[in-house]
């Protein structure tokens, strides 16, 4: 579930999922489009698996292993 995915992200990164990753880059969160803007955004792009447990875990680990750069969706061009 989305809640469980959020718990995985919190456990792996120590960051709250929605404020940190819900609108990160051009691909994380709802309605991801275009290509990823950095390594963290690429985690969302590669692991866009719609709540499949193993894939969600891989995404959470991917977030942990990448530097968080605060690349907000508002910076993406249409």
Swiss-Prot record:
Self-association state and partner proteins as the record states: Homodimer; non-covalently linked.
Binding site for Ca(2+): 27, 29, 31, 48
Group of enzyme by EC: hydrolase
Gene3D superfamilies: Phospholipase A2 domain (1.20.90.10)
Function as written in the Swiss-Prot or TrEMBL entry: Snake venom phospholipase A2 (PLA2) that exhibits myotoxin and anticoagulant activity. Displays edema-inducing activities in mouse paw. Also displays cytotoxic activity against some cell lines and myotubes, and antimicrobial activities against E.coli, C.albicans and Leishmania. PLA2 catalyzes the calcium-dependent hydrolysis of the 2-acyl groups in 3-sn-phosphoglycerides.
Protein location: Secreted
Keyword set includes Signal: no
Gene Ontology CC: one annotated term: extracellular region
Reactions it catalyzes: a 1,2-diacyl-sn-glycero-3-phosphocholine + H2O = a 1-acyl-sn-glycero-3-phosphocholine + a fatty acid + H(+)
UniProt cofactor(s): Ca(2+)
Assigned protein family: Belongs to the phospholipase A2 family. Group II subfamily. D49 sub-subfamily.
UniProt EC number: 3.1.1.4
Active site residues per record: 47, 56
Protein's UniProt name: Basic phospholipase A2 myotoxin-I
Membrane-spanning residues: none
GO molecular function: calcium ion binding; calcium-dependent phospholipase A2 activity; phospholipid binding; toxin activity
Coiled-coil stretches noted in the UniProt entry, renumbered to this chain: none
Pfam families associated with the record: Phospholip_A2_1
Cofactor note: Binds 1 Ca(2+) ion.
UniProt keyword terms in alphabetical order: Antibiotic, Antimicrobial, Blood coagulation cascade inhibiting toxin, Calcium, Disulfide bond, Hemostasis impairing toxin, Hydrolase, Lipid degradation, Lipid metabolism, Metal-binding, Myotoxin, Secreted, Toxin
GO biological process: arachidonate secretion; defense response to bacterium; lipid catabolic process; negative regulation of T cell proliferation; phospholipid metabolic process
InterPro entries in alphabetical order: PLipase_A2, PLipase_A2_Asp_AS, PLipase_A2_dom, PLipase_A2_dom_sf
UniProt keyword NAD present: no
Disulfide bond entries: 28-44, 43-62
Tissues with expression: Expressed by the venom gland.
């Amino acid at each position: 579930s989305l809640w469980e995915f959020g718990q995985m992200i919190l456990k792996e990164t120590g960051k709250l999922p929605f404020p940190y990753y819900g609108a990160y880059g051009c691909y994380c969160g709802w309605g991801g489009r275009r290509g990823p803007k950095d390594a963290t955004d690429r985690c969302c792009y590669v692991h866009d698996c719609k709540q499949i447990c193993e894939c969600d875990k891989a995404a959470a680990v991917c977030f942990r292993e990448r530097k968080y750069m605060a690349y907000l969706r508002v910076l993406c061009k249409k």
